[in-house]
Structure formats: structure tokens, C-alpha cells
């Protein structure tokens, strides 16, 4: 790395001094960027790292920020297949409170904790007269294996393609790279009374919804 010297004059009242000023050439820091894509799994989502990062568009940010289903609004109906492949409509549950929770994926650490926490408190939800329903983008076969392995006593619905998630405006995390974890409590008339979002403390969803149901 080459260097050159120059000088400048410093005036201090009656004393004049010439000080050397060292001029250094700075080169750009070299760092490697992976040219091949690499993948890692994070809470059920596959994140891809490559040398190209696409900018976040304003339209995608709008989808992340603004919910389409809000508190006080009648929840839009939908029909999805359950873990046994049978079609289930949301309107089927009118007349009783419904705890509807969207989660990223079956068999991931956070989602398994959440599912088992709902299982362990299922009798408390039943005592409150509420039905518990889980929704993710996994297919019915995945849900069946997941429910069987962990002995889940409630319904899991398959939202392949995430259509219902998008229709409801469930916000994602990490700029949409990670499917959001959001729970809705509907009253017996199908009106949204509580919306709770907490990606990284999945078991808090059970605490907050039970607290709300007991106070209602």
C-alpha cells in the first residue's frame, strides 16, 4: 500500500511550525459473498441466502403492516380440509367461541410447543365453551401425522397456498420471510374479539387467550 507525505503550517501566535501530514491510501475491504444459494430452517420457514438480495417493495410492506381482519369485525368464512381430509367451514362453529390460531409449520420447535400447550390446556378451553382450531400451510397428511404424534385433540386445517392467511392479512415476520404466528378469538356470533401476535413466545398465545375467555 503506497503512502505519500505532505505538510501544513500551524500558526500558534508567534510560533510557526511545519507538521508532516501523512496521507494514506485506503483500499476497499474485501469480503466474499456466496455465489451459491444456501438454505437454513428457522421456525418452519426455509430461508435462502444468495449474492442477490431483492428489495422489499412497498406493496409487500403494505401486506405486512395492514391487517384485513380486525377486532370488532365479523370473521370471513372459509372452508379448508382438516387432518382427516374432510372439508370444514368456519361457519360450522357459530354459536360458540372459537380460538383460531395461525402457525408457521408442523414439526418445528416453536409450533410444536404451541400445539402441545393448546393440548395441555384443551379442557380449560372446553370448560370456557370454546373450540380450538389450528391453521398452517401444511397438507392434511402432515397435519394427521402431527396430530397423531402429539395426541392433539383439536382440529388442524390445511391452508395450502396460504390463501386464508392472505385473505385475513396475517402479518409475517422478517419482512415476510417467516409466516406469522397469530391467534384470533371469535365470539359465538363469529365476531373477532381478540387478536394476539407473538412469534417467539408461542406458549403465550394459550395464556392470553385463556385469560381473555375467562374475563369475557
Swiss-Prot record:
Gene3D superfamilies: Glutaredoxin
Temperature dependence: Optimum temperature is 40 degrees Celsius.
EC code: 1.11.1.24
The reaction(s) this protein catalyses: a hydroperoxide + [thioredoxin]-dithiol = an alcohol + [thioredoxin]-disulfide + H2O
InterPro entries recorded: AhpC/TSA, Peroxiredoxin_BCP/PrxQ, Thioredoxin-like_sf, Thioredoxin_domain
Gene Ontology terms for molecular function: thioredoxin-dependent peroxiredoxin activity
Chief subcellular location: plastid
Tissue specificity field: Expressed in all tissues at the exception of roots.
Residue ranges annotated for the Thioredoxin domain, each copy included: 69-216
Compartment annotation: Plastid, Chloroplast thylakoid lumen
pH-activity relationship: Optimum pH is 8.0.
GO CC field: chloroplast thylakoid lumen
Keywords: Antioxidant, Chloroplast, Disulfide bond, Oxidoreductase, Peroxidase, Plastid, Redox-active center, Thylakoid, Transit peptide
Annotated PANTHER family: AHPC_TSA FAMILY PROTEIN (PTHR42801:SF4), THIOREDOXIN-DEPENDENT PEROXIDE REDUCTASE (PTHR42801)
Complexes and interactors: Monomer; Interacts with the plastidial thioredoxin CDSP32.
Membership in a protein family: Belongs to the peroxiredoxin family. BCP/PrxQ subfamily.
Misc. comment: The active site is a conserved redox-active cysteine residue, the peroxidatic cysteine (C(P)), which makes the nucleophilic attack on the peroxide substrate. The peroxide oxidizes the C(P)-SH to cysteine sulfenic acid (C(P)-SOH), which then reacts with another cysteine residue, the resolving cysteine (C(R)), to form a disulfide bridge. The disulfide is subsequently reduced by an appropriate electron donor to complete the catalytic cycle. In this atypical 2-Cys peroxiredoxin, C(R) is present in the same subunit to form an intramolecular disulfide.
Protein name: Peroxiredoxin Q, chloroplastic
Organism field: Arabidopsis thaliana
Amino acid at each position: 500500500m503506497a503512502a505519500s507525505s505532505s505538510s501544513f503550517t500551524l500558526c500558534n501566535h508567534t510560533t510557526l511550525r511545519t507538521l508532516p501530514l501523512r496521507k494514506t491510501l485506503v483500499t476497499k475491504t474485501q469480503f466474499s459473498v456466496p455465489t451459491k444459494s444456501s438454505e437454513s430452517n428457522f421456525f418452519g420457514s426455509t430461508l435462502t441466502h444468495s449474492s442477490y438480495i431483492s428489495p422489499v417493495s412497498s406493496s409487500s410492506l403494505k401486506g405486512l403492516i395492514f391487517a384485513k381482519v380486525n377486532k370488532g369485525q365479523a370473521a370471513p368464512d372459509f372452508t379448508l380440509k382438516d387432518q382427516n381430509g374432510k372439508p370444514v367451514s368456519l361457519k360450522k362453529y357459530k354459536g360458540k367461541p372459537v380460538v383460531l390460531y395461525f402457525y408457521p409449520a408442523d414439526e418445528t420447535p416453536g409450533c410444536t410447543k404451541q400445539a402441545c400447550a393448546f393440548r395441555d390446556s384443551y379442557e380449560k378451553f372446553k370448560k370456557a365453551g370454546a373450540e380450538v382450531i389450528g391453521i398452517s400451510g401444511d397438507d392434511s397428511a402432515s397435519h394427521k401425522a402431527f396430530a397423531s404424534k402429539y395426541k392433539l385433540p383439536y382440529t388442524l386445517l390445511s391452508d395450502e397456498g396460504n390463501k386464508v392467511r392472505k385473505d385475513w392479512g396475517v402479518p409475517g415476520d422478517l419482512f415476510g420471510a417467516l409466516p406469522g404466528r397469530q391467534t384470533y378469538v371469535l365470539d359465538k356470533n363469529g365476531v373477532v374479539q381478540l387478536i394476539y401476535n407473538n412469534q417467539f413466545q408461542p406458549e403465550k398465545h394459550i395464556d392470553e387467550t385463556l385469560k381473555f375467555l375467562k374475563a369475557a
